[in-house]
Amino acid sequence: VKKAVIAIILSFCLITLSAFAQETPQAEKKEESGQINGAAFRLDVPAEWNKVLVMYCHGYQIAGTRPNLNDPRLNLLRSAFLSRGFAFAQSAYSAQGWAVKEAVEDTEALRRYFVSKYGEPRETYVMGHSMGAVITLATIEKYPEIYQGAMPLCGPLNSILNGLQDRVFDMLVTFDYLFPETVGSLANVPKGSRLDTRKAKAALDAAPEKAAMFIKRYSIATVNELPNVLAFFYEINREIQERAGGNPFDNRNTIYDGFDDDAALNRGVKRYTADPKAREYLRQYYTPTGHITDPVLTVHTTYDQLVPGRYISEYDSFAKLAGTQDLFVAKFVVARGHCNFTIPQTLSAFDELLNWVRARKRPEAGEIK
């Protein structure tokens, strides 16, 4: 089960970490890796640096998994930026799991180190995938004077407390009701426990009509995807409870709908009370404010089994309330899967962000082809 969940993260979230320190001078570029305050990092500076720095924020990594510096997709992304003259900086963060708090601090520490060693960039941008998009957004909201723009990709840009309850917690709660003895209690989850994907698959196979109803309710394309999605969400819920000191989710006031028998489900589904301290932790890490002074361009795929597209659009509401809607643009790519962008699509989006910053030409919302 653990291998299956890890495979999801490695495939979708572009995780990149290093667990050693070394510096390797190269003829055409500078590459440096090391640690700052317990957070491994990697810096790449091309020989003909254009004086623009890109700070990259990686996605969720399961606590206890081995660091990986050689993710093929991230290597391609890094190489693409370097080939165009950009410096590229990555922090591995000093913690794993839902490490938004640590990641924002560690990313800023790495940026300061970069400036102290390689000089002040002409422009600095921050970008990231999945949970890295949350970190990107938190960074641009916290340090607006440092960055010229941000590109959060395929991440939940809504209230994390509400978003994780709506997608992660509620999916697990309702699955547990409809397919008994597959999930178990979601409060006081034992450390290291995992959801058994084989048991979940067997339950789905035994009730195909119910399975079809469930994936339609949660906009999952196929039944085969569901066990690994559930296992990943179970891990997120377990790890957040561990770091937050309790269960942050409360469904006592939730009225579930969209199922075959909503009345029966609402009568029978387990109800949970949130721990106030845990709830406050998730409020802080992170609830967007919409208070931005720099352009923010986000991109999402039209189908994402982990993060619904509406979670991207919700930042538009924050920006409207803050009076900053003109600084936020959401675009989409017609593709299936979490963070499933091509390198050309990513570079095209980044070019639009650069043009927005430099020429003050706000991109049109819509499709990136």
For each of these PLM feature ranges, what is it?
Residues 305-311:
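Conserved alpha/beta-hydrolase "acid-adjacent" motif
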Residues 327-342, 354:
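Histidine-bearing beta->alpha loop at or near hydrolase active sites
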